[in-house]
Amino acid sequence: MSSRTICKSGFDATRGELLKFRRLGFLLSVFGSLGVLTLLIVGFAWSRAEKHSSSMNLTTGFDMALFFLGILTLCICASYTAQEYTYGTLRNVLVRTPSRQAFLIGKLSALSALTLLLTLYTFLLSTAISLFMSGRHGINLTPSLEGKALLTTLAHCLNGFLGTMALGIFGIALGLIARSPIIAISLGLLWSLIIESALGGALPRIGRWLPTANFESLAQSGATGFSYIHCLSLSAFYLLVISLPALYLFKQRDVSQ
């Protein structure tokens, strides 16, 4: 297929994938749970902060909420990718769009758009809560919304999207490999929440080299012991490592069965 045909097929596939997110139940559950947890996390963080404390800033609550957003994105991406095999819809999709490359472009584009929307939603909600709570603690956060500080704040939001999307791509790769939503989600959560935590606790020196830790640090524009370049480079490396076998299996597997 020509590049022009692939682009057109990819655009059509993206539009088709986006239509899957229009279900009211899905939107209410995702945005509702994310909104409630963001409110609780940011509100709790500010309730424990001392008055006139310098440890709280405009993006502190956003950084805390990013952990749940990343896990949620991983689960959504893994589920929406693997269910194409479980429900047998991949075969029907490839009949209309024979190019598997175009299908992956559509899947990745749609999930990226959803992740961007969820990141902006979390950022705006956490910012609104922080601005409201800061007044009660005698902290002025409005300078963070002016001049160069605003650009820094927006860059922080962009990094939040990049780190969250890294977890999303990790979920997509697991979905392609496992071909089962339950298995893909279980593997993602097992590695991210249990195995990495155990490895980081038992061997602190390797903590800064683990994939999920770098994804999360990238989302927070770098963290203690994690430079931004370090997080960005390792995140790209780990995504390449997990994506190559996933793409190979997706290309070679027979989807007619």
Language model region names:
Residues 2-7, 26-27, 31-80, 104-178, ...:
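Secretory targeting signals
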Residues 97-109, 187:
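Amphipathic cytosolic juxtamembrane alpha-helices at the membrane-cytosol interface
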